[in-house]
Amino acid sequence: MPKYRSATTTYGRNMAGARALWRATGMTDSDFGKPIIAVVNSFTQFVPGHVHLRDLGKLVAEQIEASGGVAKEFNTIAVDDGIAMGHGGMLYSLPSRELIADSVEYMVNAHCADAMVCISNCDKITPGMLMASLRLNIPVIFVSGGPMEAGKTKLSDKIIKLDLVDAMIQGADPKVSDDQSNQVERSACPTCGSCSGMFTANSMNCLTEALGLSQPGNGSLLATHADRKQLFLNAGKRIVELTKRYYEQNDESALPRNIASKAAFENAMTLDIAMGGSTNTVLHLLAAAQEAEIDFTMSDIDKLSRKVPQLCKVAPSTQKYHMEDVHRAGGVLGILGELDRAGLLNRNVKNVLGLTLPQTLEQYDITVTQDEAVKKMFRAGPAGIRTTQAFSQDCRWDSLDDDRAAGCIRSLEYAYSKDGGLAVLYGNFAENGCIVKTAGVDDSILKFTGPAKVYESQDEAVEAILGGKVVEGDVVVIRYEGPKGGPGMQEMLYPTSFLKSMGLGKACALITDGRFSGGTSGLSIGHVSPEAASGGTIALIEDGDTIAIDIPNRSIQLQLSEAEIAARREAQEARGDKAWTPKNRQRQVSFALRAYASLATSADKGAVRDKSKLGG
């Protein structure tokens, strides 16, 4: 039977010094011998998705203490991708994921904590904590801050829903007046919480449900709604039960690697494809799988993408539905219920509540449950009041959206598309694959061929787009923006948003070894692997080269002969130390980012560190 890890610091005369320090934190004799549970918070005033988390760690800690544990809280960093977007700050976003994972490992192992409750929310915080949880493999429950309410404003005598991306597009559109742009900006992000569409943060918080590491409702219940408080209270109680099950009953089913099994990863990716989630989730699931020592690769994602339909369509793919609408339609369990009925899920998985997938669906799928409390929870809706406070309102929809023919969530029979919302493409300059969010691609451009316009930085591409140098039919190629080449694999939300602003959203393609925001839509193909800085063929593309994209056939091709590609590769290698680097880019890269780049792998490996360079 495993011994409490914390006993290392609380048991025996030789640990008198450690106990003396524990006493200085408020512990007493009666606390020694209880499980010490880390409350891993990520409160910051920089990020709307985290601005309301300050008191929520205390809420969880109180429940841990009341349930027989000792709670000790610490904080991680949290980068707001939207605020870091479009300038040098975005270089730091993806690397912050590794810092978060490492900092959790450092704190938990340094102090020998027995278990964790992870209070996350936004883009890199949930993945970083997920990576740490699977690396450490001690009992854990995730409870996120919850989604932001959708913005609303009146334009042309019509009330429309808004989010961050609308503010960006309108702000860059020369046809939009200053007054209208300002109106949209002021209305787009009305409350605390993760941005209101199916962007990266909300996608990842939904996926923790599918992995089994968070409670039903975690991914969709609004940050402002009073019902969300119960998730935090339950997490504090439940983590003590999980911890005692493992340490006192030798029940390894309580460990995250046994909950988030390969079958659970496949379910999570199936959910992601069905709901048209962010392409960043591919990056993060691949990284998390490596921490869990699970053989889950781009090949697995490709296989799933070929058979899973799109059953949910949410902003940025449509402005009709946001996360508050997904919740009204049954949230993650609503989508999983339809996938289960279609025979597309692994049913032999459990979650942190100890329930199998069929048991969870029986209780929480709104189309079958008889539990009125569950139905009431899924009627939790927005209040439309600007606030930075969690649990500040208790408004409810008059009814649930259980229309699986024409509602937000569809059944297999009425799927938005028989093809899923994400696809993996392969070709002669993406030998290890690349990713496109098909949910955001107009049907008219699922096949697209055009001349390349090549840029060696996001900034250069933005200048060209706004300067009118990109025209209808072009394929914009942005390279040397991968994990190593950026470094940091910047998100390309500004280039894609500005293409829309210039009326080119359905007339151009954009390809990059960087990545895209969860807010991106259009023919935007990212994660090209291998990246340019790692010798990828994307580094050999020249202006005017023809690129052919065929999403239905999962193909992307540079239309050059093998001999010409080989000749260009030879010329690139002849540059010596300058080979596989941008020719003209001027970019200041800090020592910290250079250290990250020195170990970074390409996107097909999740952009994790290359363990072979560390003897791992």
Swiss-Prot record:
It comes from the Bacteria. It is an enzyme of class 4 (lyase). Mg(2+) binds at residues 81, 123-124, 491. InterPro entries: Dihydro-acid_dehy_C (IPR042096), DihydroxyA_deHydtase (IPR004404), DiOHA_6PGluconate_deHydtase_CS (IPR020558), ILV_EDD_C (IPR056740), ILV_EDD_N (IPR000581), IlvD/EDD_N (IPR037237). Keywords: 2Fe-2S, Amino-acid biosynthesis, Branched-chain amino acid biosynthesis, Iron, Iron-sulfur, Lyase, Magnesium, Metal-binding. The modification N6-carboxylysine is found at residue 124. The keyword Cell wall biogenesis/degradation does not apply. It catalyses: (2R)-2,3-dihydroxy-3-methylbutanoate = 3-methyl-2-oxobutanoate + H2O; (2R,3R)-2,3-dihydroxy-3-methylpentanoate = (S)-3-methyl-2-oxopentanoate + H2O. This is Dihydroxy-acid dehydratase. Pathway: Amino-acid biosynthesis; L-isoleucine biosynthesis; L-isoleucine from 2-oxobutanoate: step 3/4; Amino-acid biosynthesis; L-valine biosynthesis; L-valine from pyruvate: step 3/4. Gene3D superfamilies: IlvD/EDD C-terminal domain-like (3.50.30.80).
